[in-house]
Amino acid sequence: MLGGFMLAFLGRETSLISVAVLLSLCFLLVNLLSKRTFPKIETERVLQSLGEGFRFIAKTKIVPWAISLDLVSVLFGGVIALLPIFAEDILKIGPEGLGYLRAAPSIGALITMIALTRFPPTRHAWRNMLLAVAGFGLFTLLFAYSDYLWLSLFALAMTGACDSISVVIRQTILQIYPPENMRGRVAAVNGMFVSSSNELGAFESGLAAKYLGPVIATVFGGSMTLLVVALSWAKTKDLFGVDITQAEQK
């Protein structure tokens, strides 16, 4: 969010210099931290540890579906990589407008996170997650067809809001369902998929925009997200009643 506003009001050069200065400051502060010692624990090979994480995930139902749903929605539904094209060629709002577009999803996510502290989506968590991802796809389609800045900002803010709901539910599921000795392994597997899907999603968006155009590429991404939600809805109806608050108490 701050990056978008910095780009809008300070320009590209000042924003990049500010980021470099802040990163350098973080590096210095980390090096000033005192060293800590930890008790020795039995270590495993990385591949062996990841393999155990994959095996545990395969034994459950809600965990692999949660990871897969997020993976596909980010891989196909993300539009962040295409925002410069929309700002320049479609909305014609220039660098300042691009900053607003970049900030909109973060603003939507921030407002939603604050609301979730009062109204957590824990009852019928899986159904809520599917609805949130479906909303992400629908608002992606709305952004693709928007010719107005205010409507584009609203659509992007709502994608951030829906994504934040999905993230909260998914992260809670990944913390509650694995036993204590498997949480790190499951988190590592999830982190591997999340980090790779973000980069591959940007590549997919750029490749699709090159051959289909930015609007059709965004429509394709939103449609694929809705298709995955429909498939998940049909295959996981038995999970609709899941209450992750009760699972946490157990």
What are these regions (language model features)?
Residues M1-K250:
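Alpha-helical transmembrane-bundle signature of multi-pass membrane transport and export proteins
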